[in-house]
């Protein structure tokens, strides 16, 4: 058998496999570096350099320059050219990351309504509750 003090290799060093004729002993090749179109300068298995991928950044889905190749429909509503689609804000959201409480929202709503009100000074003004709009009886 093999010598336990020889090291981690269970085969004695004098055993040489013929060039691939024995199915139990395939020709020596490193499975970490499979033959292929990968350039030899890029180390395989490095997450910074994925195997056989282009070194330039790949555009993200939904952004300009990206055409989805799958069966997925385009994002709705379609974004303007040159802009990525943005999700509509949830109710209560005013801007990106700004949430207003009910009290402040009510105050803002009131102020907004006020700014849209047309102040017409005349007979049909709804602000006056007195009946002075009718003609007076002084003859």
From Swiss-Prot:
Coiled-coil portions: none
Spans traversing the lipid bilayer: none
Biased composition (Pro residues): 24-62, 70-91
Compositionally skewed regions (Low complexity) per UniProt: 125-139
Source taxon at top rank: Eukaryota
Extent of Basic residues compositional bias: 103-124
Keywords: Nucleus, Transcription, Transcription regulation
GO cellular component: nucleoplasm
Location of this chain's protein in the cell: Nucleus
Region (Disordered): 1-139
Keyword Nucleus part of the UniProt annotation: yes
UniProt-listed PANTHER family: PROLINE-RICH PROTEIN 13, PTHR36287
Function: Negatively regulates TSP1 expression at the level of transcription. This down-regulation was shown to reduce taxane-induced apoptosis.
Record protein name field: Proline-rich protein 13
